[in-house]
Amino acid sequence: MQGTMRLWVSVLTFALSLLICLGTLAEAYPSKPDSPGEDAPAEDMARYYSALRHYINLITRQRYGKRSSPETLISDLLLRESTENIPRSRFEDPSMW
């Protein structure tokens, strides 16, 4: 009797902690703004489009850190458009000659 009771308490504790973790993950992601409808006034549509633009910027922003792989860093260095930050050789400088 006590063994089954202990099993049920542990299963209930696990299920509750799993629900808490899933709830925390769901709150961390921004929710899409609600559409005001087709016949909404211009002010409501402007607010909706502003909120939608903010939402899209949040979910598509670039992430740095552990997600940056060495391959992407190398390709960024090789395919860089500006050459002002690339170190030059000593022999390319005319003052050396």
Curated annotation (Swiss-Prot):
Query: Does the UniProt entry include the keyword Cytoplasm?
Result: no
Annotated Gene Ontology cellular component terms? extracellular space; neuronal dense core vesicle
Record PTM Tyrosine amide, positions in chain? 64
Q: Name one GO biological process term.
A: neuropeptide signaling pathway
Which InterPro entries does UniProt cross-reference here? Pancreatic_hormone-like (IPR001955), Pancreatic_hormone-like_CS (IPR020392)
Where located?
A: Secreted; Cytoplasmic vesicle, Secretory vesicle, Neuronal dense core vesicle
The entry assigns this protein to a family as follows: Belongs to the NPY family.
* Role: NPY is implicated in the control of feeding and in secretion of gonadotrophin-release hormone.
Protein name listed in UniProt: Pro-neuropeptide Y
